[in-house]
């Protein structure tokens, strides 16, 4: 479904309209036209734009036109440089995947849920007609298993309301445990044939997150070489097996919306991991979005940059730490 629309390999624009300080300086300058051109020149076919609800919606549910004007500019630049666009709602009123955010209550609060529906109806009115170029990602990384029942209900209602406005737009839908692949099986059957199951992959965690200080599952001082990890084609085949079978059962496809490796891993070992996981993605026709983007305070690298990607990106691994550590040439010409 996504491949037929030219959406196969993408890159994340995190830290711009989400996970940020919302300052005008950040919103005006974090990503510029040349950055979008560079992404296209690297050979990517789409970008993922995470947005937080407060970019486009006031607390009373009313529209913030400045936020939509900014999204309009991204749409225009993507069209100019031949890129497709995934609009990802990274945070909604009452919920964020980031436990450090002061958002809670979404799954039990009808007012928050109505704001979620209204927000997506507005996005659908503005962008839902451009079905060849724009995809909607309903919500980033539902966390707790306890939420899945209500999330199935909420997402189905929301998709139904979107469909009254934008009947043909593709919608990405993820499950709990932060869009884990093995929880796709607990999603309801797709609302219709234009819903794609979405998952994220940072596995095996002890390899991709080695040195991380934000998860109790990792001892920060421990290091692991690629050869000492579980990583293999067979490992990912098993990890993705229930997601693949669930998608096949319901006649839909899969999208991996985030994946990568932390910066302490060598470029060589990172490249090995990317090559293995991308081989499995390609085998099963899974489109994907690599979580590479720019550093918080500096510009995108040029094609001749000799620094590693870890020096020029922002993370989407929970804490804004960089994570894909190959050289630019390796990442953009070899891992895909």
From Swiss-Prot:
It is found in: Secreted. The keyword Secreted applies. Keywords: Carbohydrate metabolism, Cellulose degradation, Glycosidase, Hydrolase, Polysaccharide degradation, Secreted. Crystalline cellulose degradation. Its EC number is 3.2.1.-. This is Cellodextrinase A. The active site is at 141 (proton donor). Belongs to the glycosyl hydrolase 5 (cellulase A) family. GO terms for molecular function: beta-glucosidase activity. PANTHER family: ENDOGLUCANASE, PUTATIVE (AFU_ORTHOLOGUE AFUA_5G01830)-RELATED, GLUCAN ENDO-1,6-BETA-GLUCOSIDASE B. One of its GO terms (biological process) is cellulose catabolic process. It is an enzyme of class 3 (hydrolase). GO terms for cellular component: cell surface; extracellular region.
């Amino acid at each position: 479904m996504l491949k037929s629309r030219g959406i196969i390999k993408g890159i994340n624009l995190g830290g711009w309209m989400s996970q940020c300080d919302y300052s005008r300086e950040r919103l005006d300058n974090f990503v510029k036209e040349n950055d979008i051109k560079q992404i296209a020149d690297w050979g990517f076919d789409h970008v993922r734009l995470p947005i937080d609800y407060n970019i486009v919606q006031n607390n009373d549910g009313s529209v913030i036109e400045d936020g939509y004007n900014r999204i309009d500019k991204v749409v225009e630049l993507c069209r100019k440089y031949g890129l497709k666009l995934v609009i990802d709602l990274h945070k909604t009123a009452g919920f964020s995947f980031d436990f450090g955010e002061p958002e809670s209550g979404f799954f039990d609060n009808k007012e928050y849920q109505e704001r979620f529906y209204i927000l997506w109806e507005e996005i659908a009115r503005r962008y839902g007609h451009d079905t060849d170029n724009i995809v909607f990602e309903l919500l980033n990384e539902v966390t707790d298993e306890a939420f899945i029942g209500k999330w199935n209900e909420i997402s189905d209602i929301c998709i139904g309301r979107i469909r009254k406005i934008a009947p043909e737009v593709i919608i990405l839908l993820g499950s709990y445990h932060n869009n884990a692949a093995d929880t796709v099986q607990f999603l309801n059957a797709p609302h219709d044939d234009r819903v794609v199951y979405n998952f994220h992959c940072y596995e095996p965690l002890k390899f991709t997150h080695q040195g991380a200080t934000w998860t109790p599952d990792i001892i920060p001082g421990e290091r692991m070489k690629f050869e000492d990890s579980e990583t293999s084609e067979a490992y990912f085949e098993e990890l993705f097996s229930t997601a693949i079978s669930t998608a096949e059962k319901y006649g839909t496809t899969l999208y991996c919306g985030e994946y990568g490796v932390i910066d302490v891993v060598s470029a060589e070992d990172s490249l090995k991991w990317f090559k293995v996981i991308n081989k499995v993605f390609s085998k099963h026709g899974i489109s994907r979005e690599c979580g590479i983007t720019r550093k918080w305070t500096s510009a995108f690298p040029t094609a001749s940059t000799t620094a590693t990607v870890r020096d020029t990106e922002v993370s989407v691994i929970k804490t804004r730490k960089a994570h894909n550590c190959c050289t630019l040439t390796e990442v953009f010409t070899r891992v895909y």
